[in-house]
C-alpha cells in the first residue's frame, strides 16, 4: 500500500520508491547477515545439543536392564524391599478400612512412630537372608535407599508421616521393558517413590522406559468418609456393587492389584485401586496388552497376589476363602486352577496389614523353582507334588509388615518373550 501511494505522487513518488528501495535493500542485507549469523549459531548449538543428547543416551546396550512379561519366566534381577525405619501409618480412614479391627488400638497408639524395634530388627535380618539366598540362586538383587519414614510432610490437601519401602510390588510394576510407578492411595505412601528413584534412574540411563502414573492429590474427595467399617455384611454388599473406601475422584492404584500373564494383565477394583486407575493402565498399555478386571468374594480386597497368584503358563493359585467370580474365563482357556492348603501361621502372630494367606504369596524363580515360607509345610508339599522345587526361607516377622515373597519383591528382569496365554 505504501508503494502504490508513492507512485501516485509523481516525481516525489519515484524518489520515495528509490529511497524506500535503498532502505529496504540495506534492511534486507542486514537481516540476511543477522539471519545467517543466527543460523550459524543455531547450527553450532544444535550440534552441541545433539552431542550432549548422544552422550546422555548413546550408546544404548543391546539388552535392556528391564524386561519382564509374566510371573514365572527365569528370574535374573529383582528389587527387594527394606524394613529399616518402617513406620506405623497414621490411623486415617483408608488405613482403617484396610486393617483388621483387632489391630486398631495398635494403630491409634503407634501411628506416626516406628514399628516395634525388636520386631523390625528380626524382619531386617530375615530379608537380608532372603537376599543372600536369591543371590546364591543366581539372581541380581537391588535394594531401595534407606529413608527415615517418621518425618512429617504436608501438601495443600493433607499432612502425614511415611510408611516404608518394604513392598516394591505395591509401587512398581514392570511390563516388558517399561517400569511404571503406581499412584498409590494411602497418604502415608505419597513419597514412597523417593526410595526407588536412584534404582529407576539407573535403569533409565541404561535404556529402560520409565513412566510415572498421574499422582493423586489425595484430597478428602478421594475417600468415602462414611464408608461402613464395622459391618462385614455391608462391606460384602458394597464390594459387590464396586464401592470401596476410595472413590472415583481421581485415578489411583497399587501395582500389587495387577498380575501379569504375557499379553493379558488381570486387575481388581480394591480399597486402594479404583476403576479410573485401572482404565489409565488399560489405555496406557493398549494395544499390546489387554487389562481384564476380575473380582472376588472378598469384603476387603487389597492386592491381588494373596488371592489370585499366577505361578506358571496357565497355572494359578486361587484362594478358597476368596473365590474368583470370573474363574470360568480361565477354565475355558484350559488353565489349571490350584487350591492352596490352609496356612498354618499361629493366631497369635501379629499380621498388622495382611491375612494368613501370605502363604500363597510366593515368588517364582522360574517354572520349576519357588521361594516359599520355611514354616508353611503344607504348601511346600503342594509344590513338590507339582514337580516344583521349593526354596525355603523364613520371613515370618517380615510378614507382619504386610507381605510375603511376592510383595517384598519387584521382578525387574526375567528371561522370556511376550506371549499370549489366554487365547
Curated annotation (Swiss-Prot):
Homodimer. Arginine binds at residues 170, 305, 322, 354-355. GO terms for biological process: creatine biosynthetic process; learning or memory; muscle atrophy; positive regulation of cold-induced thermogenesis. The active site is at residues 254, 303, 407. Transamidinase that catalyzes the transfer of the amidino group of L-arginine onto the amino moiety of acceptor metabolites such as glycine, beta-alanine, gamma-aminobutyric acid (GABA) and taurine yielding the corresponding guanidine derivatives. Catalyzes the rate-limiting step of creatine biosynthesis, namely the transfer of the amidino group from L-arginine to glycine to generate guanidinoacetate, which is then methylated by GAMT to form creatine. Provides creatine as a source for ATP generation in tissues with high energy demands, in particular skeletal muscle, heart and brain. Keywords: Acetylation, Membrane, Mitochondrion, Mitochondrion inner membrane, Phosphoprotein, Transferase, Transit peptide. Its main location: mitochondrion. It is found in: Mitochondrion inner membrane. The gene is GATM. The modification Phosphoserine is found at residues 46, 49. Belongs to the amidinotransferase family. The modification N6-acetyllysine is found at residue 385. Its EC number is 2.1.4.1. It catalyses: L-arginine + glycine = guanidinoacetate + L-ornithine; 4-aminobutanoate + L-arginine = 4-guanidinobutanoate + L-ornithine; beta-alanine + L-arginine = 3-guanidinopropanoate + L-ornithine; taurine + L-arginine = taurocyamine + L-ornithine. Residues 39-51 have a biased composition (Low complexity). Coiled coil: none annotated. InterPro entries: AmidinoTrfase. GO terms for cellular component: mitochondrial inner membrane; mitochondrial intermembrane space. Residues 52-61 have a biased composition (Basic and acidic residues). Residues 1-48 form a transit peptide. Pathway: Amine and polyamine biosynthesis; creatine biosynthesis; creatine from L-arginine and glycine: step 1/2. GO terms for molecular function: amidinotransferase activity; glycine amidinotransferase activity. This is Glycine amidinotransferase, mitochondrial. Residues 39-65 are annotated as: Disordered.
